[in-house]
Amino acid sequence: MTEKKYIVALDQGTTSSRAVVMDHDANIVSVSQREFEQIYPKPGWVEHDPMEIWASQSSTLVEVLAKADISSDQIAAIGITNQRETAIVWERETGKPIYNAIVWQCRRTADICEQLKRDGLEDYIRDNTGLVVDPYFSGTKVKWILDHVEGSRERAKRGELLFGTVDTWLIWKMTQGRVHVTDYTNASRTMLFNIHDLDWDDKMLDVLDIPRAMLPQVRKSSEVYGQTNIGGKGGTRIPIAGIAGDQQAALFGQLCVKEGMAKNTYGTGCFMLMNTGEKAVKSENGLLTTIACGPSGEVNYALEGAVFMAGASIQWLRDEMKLISDAFDSEYFATKVKDTNGVYVVPAFTGLGAPYWDPYARGAIFGLTRGVNSNHIIRATLESIAYQTRDVLEAMQADSGIRLHALRVDGGAVANNFLMQFQSDILGTRVERPEVREVTALGAAYLAGLAVGYWQNLDELQEKAVIEREFRPGIETTERNYRYSGWKKAVKRAMAWEEHDK
């Protein structure tokens, strides 16, 4: 029998699908990536073609094996991680979607959400699903599809239509329609799942008029769900053995599996998650309560805060403001000045996320004086990412009663040493940057590998986790508090801006 040398992680993201091959030491052997089309039918609406998601993801799986000259019988298992909340409805018989995937960023269901609030359901939804009422989550998207595609609700009741988040859709396609499952982490993002009973919530299904017959079975994040024989030479059936939504996969990839451990992912936005162990902590500070992966893929809970604009604000400096020609240049210009000269940038281009949840806030620059130049604005924009992270961390510490000792970081912007040092300064906490930056894929690989015995336990994984660089706070507490109070003042003035125009 051929030795099972590798694990494959499929990382299905918002703008691209990736496949990553890892070896036993958690080194990356090969990567393949394909972008796919973003569809914007109306302002604020975002869709993907589910068939294109599948085509891009399945082709990266074939490519990544061919690139590294690996046959499928050398693969121990496949793990899947995915953009969360994005909703797909398809025909059980044909596997054809009845509508495009409605993406997590899509705001078309704002009216449905307003109605849920008017019906007094906010507390019920927060208490039982852990979520706030927002178009972000899958439930209202599924309702919208059933409301707008003729005859679909009746077909769903008859069991002819299926719903799934992206993980469910991929596994359905990979198993030729034999397996209709999701995991606890993805289910916890639908607004249809009771995170305490660990089952679909009948009241929410009733409120949104979504038939139970169309929902997938919910399973642990680390177990064998089915087999696939797609990809590579040899045509061996490979077990699909791990699933986690992208942010929960990153939390697991960073090995934040104990209560009180936290990670922040710096992508287009920032996603910060803190593991709260076996207790679901209800947030009083605008955070989400969500399901995370425990040491062997079982249910743990986490607090989550999302910042909408992180890397996106650096793109704004480059694309709209033309202050830099490359995102990497931001660090160089930021370090050409000793501080921001009193300037604060609040990048609330699409409102503010956690812990404010103000859709009417708008971007603003405060503290401008005649001596301010472009370097000060670049520096203040980078600093805004760290300030927003502190906002979320303060809320997490208040909710959980846990004082964070170190923040593990990942995502594109962590390559920026200035930002990481300022993050440590403004938090007053160690910031740990890992050697392997692909922590989302790593999390999916770990979950799959543990399920099939490729890795024995977490201790074995801990030995492989290398911190490439640790940043420690370099400013005094009084200075830290002074700077942060300026940020709070700036945010307050940027809030509720849009309403004045209406």
From Swiss-Prot:
Amino acids binding sn-glycerol 3-phosphate: T14, R84, E85, Y136, D246
Pathway: Polyol metabolism; glycerol degradation via glycerol kinase pathway; sn-glycerol 3-phosphate from glycerol: step 1/1
Gene Ontology terms for molecular function: ATP binding; glycerol kinase activity; metal ion binding
Entry keyword annotation includes ATP-binding: yes
Catalytic activity: glycerol + ATP = sn-glycerol 3-phosphate + ADP + H(+)
InterPro entries listed in its UniProt record: ATPase_NBD, Carb_kinase_FGGY, Carb_kinase_FGGY_CS, FGGY_C, FGGY_N, Glycerol_kin
Gene3D superfamilies according to UniProt: 3.30.420.40
Residues reported to bind ATP: T14, T15, S16, T268, G311, Q315, G412
Pfam families in alphabetical order: FGGY_C, FGGY_N
Enzyme class per UniProt: transferase
Binding site for ADP: T14, R18, T268, G311, G412, N416
Gene Ontology CC: cytosol
Source organism superkingdom: Bacteria
E.C. code: 2.7.1.30
Keyword Metal-binding: yes
Keywords of this entry: Allosteric enzyme, ATP-binding, Glycerol metabolism, Kinase, Metal-binding, Nucleotide-binding, Transferase, Zinc
Binding site for glycerol: R84, E85, Y136, D246, Q247
GO biological processes: glycerol catabolic process; glycerol metabolic process; glycerol-3-phosphate metabolic process
Regulation of its function: Activity of this regulatory enzyme is affected by several metabolites. Allosterically and non-competitively inhibited by fructose 1,6-bisphosphate (FBP) and unphosphorylated phosphocarrier protein EIIA-Glc (III-Glc), an integral component of the bacterial phosphotransferase (PTS) system.
Record-stated family: Belongs to the FGGY kinase family.
Function: Key enzyme in the regulation of glycerol uptake and metabolism. Catalyzes the phosphorylation of glycerol to yield sn-glycerol 3-phosphate.
Subunit details: Homotetramer and homodimer (in equilibrium). Heterodimer with EIIA-Glc. Binds 1 zinc ion per glycerol kinase EIIA-Glc dimer. The zinc ion is important for dimerization.
NCBIfam families assigned to the protein according to its UniProt record, in alphabetical order: glycerol_kin, PRK00047.1
Protein known as: Glycerol kinase
Organism: Salmonella paratyphi B (strain ATCC BAA-1250 / SPB7)
Gene field: glpK
